[in-house]
Structure formats: C-alpha cells, structure tokens
Amino acid sequence: MDKKAARIRRATKARRKMLELGATRLVVHRTPRHIYAQVIAASGAEVLASASTVESTIREQVKYTGNADAAAAVGKAIAERALAKGVTTVAFDRSGFQYHGRVAALAAAAREAGLQF
C-alpha cells in the first residue's frame, strides 16, 4: 500500500464515523503549496463555508501559502465564515493527514476564533 492509499483509507474510516454520528465536518486538505478547509453539512451534501490559501484575501495576509502561518490564516477565516452561517460546533476531519504542523495550526486558529471541536 502506498502512502496516498494509506491516507485515503484512514480518511474513509474517520468520515464513516462522522457520518454515523451526524456531525457537521470541518474538512482539511493539504498540498505542498496550499491548504484548503471546508465546513460540510451533516448530510454531506452541502458546503456551508470554505477558505483556502488560493483566495486573494488570504494571499494578501501571508507571504507564503505553504506554511503554518498561512494555515492559521485559513483557520481563522473558516471559523469566521462558519460562525456567520450559524455553525458553532463541528467535527474535525483531517482527511487522514497527521495532526501536526499546518493541520494543527489550522485547527488551533479555528478554535481560537470561536469554532468548537
């Protein structure tokens, strides 16, 4: 099993449990250059809020898009947008990525901005 297949297997197991619980998810996807976050409804059919380092508003705030500072900016933005839609509690879906570095920075910033998980 290669590295990507193992990550997808871990992500699938976690997502199955979150769907079983019926929780609104904060989904994170990470690439070497960017980080993306989406708040997805409990049904899995609707994206309630999204933020990423591809957006010009976040690119203006950070010098580089592939580091922990950029991830923290995305975390703050996604929390603000989710709270504006009335979402206060989410389940953190790290998509099989290790809870470390940029993923942890995004989570910490989202918690600091008022999102509960």
UniProtKB/Swiss-Prot annotation:
Highest taxon of the lineage = Bacteria
Please provide, in alphabetical order, the Gene Ontology terms of the cellular component aspect for this entry: cytosolic large ribosomal subunit
Q: List the disulfide bonds.
A: none
Sorted alphabetically, which keywords does the UniProt record give? Ribonucleoprotein, Ribosomal protein, RNA-binding, rRNA-binding
Q: Does the keyword rRNA-binding apply?
A: yes
- Keyword check for Ribosomal protein, yes or no: yes
Which molecular function term from Gene Ontology is one that the record holds?
5S rRNA binding
InterPro entries according to UniProt? Ribosomal_uL18_bac-type (IPR004389), Ribosomal_uL18_bac/euk (IPR005484)
What are its GO biological-process terms?
Answer: translation
SUPFAM superfamilies in the record: Translational machinery components
Self-association and partners: Part of the 50S ribosomal subunit; part of the 5S rRNA/L5/L18/L25 subcomplex. Contacts the 5S and 23S rRNAs.
Query: Which family does this protein fall into?
Result: Belongs to the universal ribosomal protein uL18 family.
**What is the recorded function of this protein according to its Swiss-Prot or TrEMBL entry?**
This is one of the proteins that bind and probably mediate the attachment of the 5S RNA into the large ribosomal subunit, where it forms part of the central protuberance.
| Protein name, entry field | Large ribosomal subunit protein uL18
Organism, scientific name: Tolumonas auensis (strain DSM 9187 / NBRC 110442 / TA 4)
Q: What is the lineage of its organism?
A: Bacteria, Pseudomonadati, Pseudomonadota, Gammaproteobacteria, Aeromonadales
